[in-house]
Amino acid sequence: WGYGKFGSQNESNNLAEDLEIVTGCLREDFKLRPEEDGARIIGNLTFEERNRRGEWMSINCRDDVGDSGYGVPYNVESEKLRLVSHDIDFMMAIETGGMFDRLVENGFDENARCGLIHLKGQPARSTRRIMKRMNEEWGLPIVVFTDCDPWSFRIFASIAYGAIKTAHISEYLATPSAVYLGIDSDDIQAYDLPADELTSRDIEALKAEKSDPRFQSQEWMDQIDLMLELGQKAEQQSLAKYGLDFVTDTYLPEKLRQKLGIVIG
């Protein structure tokens, strides 16, 4: 037989996907651990996580963690992680670490009665799964706060509708009721945000999204068309043009009121 080594990472990834499809089980059931990190969570939520000795540990994501938050494990199914209680009104998923840290520093989780979850860019499976569970089991709305570029749009799409690579388990990972909060193309104009020119790769990605089934709503078509018309993209950090507290004092309260009817304060 010789050595059973994989020639590349893609070989093992494809095998894991095939196993999931053939068996109807998740890769976590096979103890296959991804290299990707899970999210960080801050907020008044309490979980119970089973430790290596098989004992349940109670963890409050506000009182029992430091500023970096609770690290989401690779397996967040009920046999490893229990959702115990919460005293929040919604979960906000945040793309960048800098913005997550800013919201934590400003105490936005307590002021807005929300949980904050750092996506670390394209979210890991465990990140999407725990958001799905909190939405279904606790009835918490999921709102997504990202940069304004085609790649960030795809981050939202992977949360709300699922990713191509994990299409076979979208029912476990996707949260169709998730709401895209911003930054969107309208904000570049409305808030006169510092912006960068779209690259040829950005433009190609936006044109591809116009035929992507996940972006066929009129709202998404309008956003994509406006970005192409402006020829610009913007980062979350562009909101710092108006000071470090602008995002928590003005921008997010305005967007939450507009899109979800949530009034802060």
Predicted regions and their residues:
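Nucleic-acid enzyme cleavage-core boundary/entry regions
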Residues: 1-141, 150-265
